[in-house]
Amino acid sequence: MIKSNVDNAASRIREHIRQTPFEKSELISKMTGAEVWLKMENQQFTGSFKFRGAINKMLSLNDAQRKSGIYAASTGNHGAAVALASKILGVPCIVYVPENSSEAKLENMRNFGADIKVFGSDCMEGEIEARKVADNTGGIYVSPYNDPEIVFGQGTIAEEIHSQCDGLDTIIVSVGGGGMISGVGGYLKSVWPDIEVIAASPENHAVMIKSCLLYTSPSPRDLLK
């Protein structure tokens, strides 16, 4: 199922994105003793993979939905991606950012056409506010990760990798909210079942790993309540 959805997303967004290079890193290969290849998403529009998900989500909406108002919450990359996608499709967007946001990242979002609203001390407070405003006004909130169309859009990285090499033993994917690894890992597992998918997070911001460690599976009795 995920492969067909990602393939559909790839067809939908192809004219709007860059197919980024997939290049061998001689330095990292030498350092690790493995053959290491890099998917150069830093060369994607807006400078990150986030644009894939944002433009796929926006293209999945109809005209009335787009014109109802586009809202996002971000500290930088997702906001820039939603802003550029909105600009391409000719609709305004509002991005909620925390008070301590980088001025350089704010300016980048403004350059792509975002209307910036400063709210709260962290991105989660901004996300809650953006969702609330979108719900109250009939607008659309564009999540950075928690949306199937975002996942399928970001999964197009894997669709490209599949066409750029004959196979991989292992792929290491950075993880924040989990949108990219859901799309990339799901797609590659469907075409190369034996591939090992490894999630990587910075030690000082390992929110996904901490969430998984805190999760407690419900008992059968709880499920019957």
Could you say what each language-model-derived stretch is?
Residues 1-217, 221:
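PLP-dependent amino-acid enzyme catalytic core
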Residues 223-225:
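N-terminal low-complexity segments that are often proline-rich with Ser/Thr-Pro
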